[in-house]
Amino acid sequence: PETNQEYLKGKPYTSCGELAAYYRIQVAADEEGTASVAVTESMMQMWGITKEQLHKDAMQAAHARSPVCLYDMEEVMAESIFSVKPENLFNREEPLDIGFVPIYILTNQDKLNGASVSAQEGVLEKVAELLGTNYYVLPSSIHELLILPDNGSMQLSELEAMVREVN
């Protein structure tokens, strides 16, 4: 949040670790794209709602519109080559089998502004249950986060380099 203080000024936001989740209202969507506007504190005052209510409503609407998805990155890459839809691992009941250190993509079904799913209650906890281990959350874009299980072999400098490379 510190590096984006100017942009976040006058906008309600929720801190998610080192990231800040702010709120947007979708005003139009068609085959050419989606248009949205950032919610401001003055809008909240006009509506007579608190930041807590805004967050609760936004999370419910986001989940209803586009559920949380966790994909194996290899399957996502294969989708672009072979047009095979990757399995959404987020809805599994049993832990994932992590033989090697895979990279997962955390997003939403629409793959639009999907990094925001990390602000939804219980999402990061569910990822921990599925992985059965600690993990790193690496920012990739506003549309997705990379999830990397911690097997103890990665150094902070390697993770930082990975984030720079992806971005």
Where are these regions (language model features)?
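A contiguous, surface-oriented mixed alpha/beta subdomain in the mid-to-C-terminal portion of proteins
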Residues: N4-N167
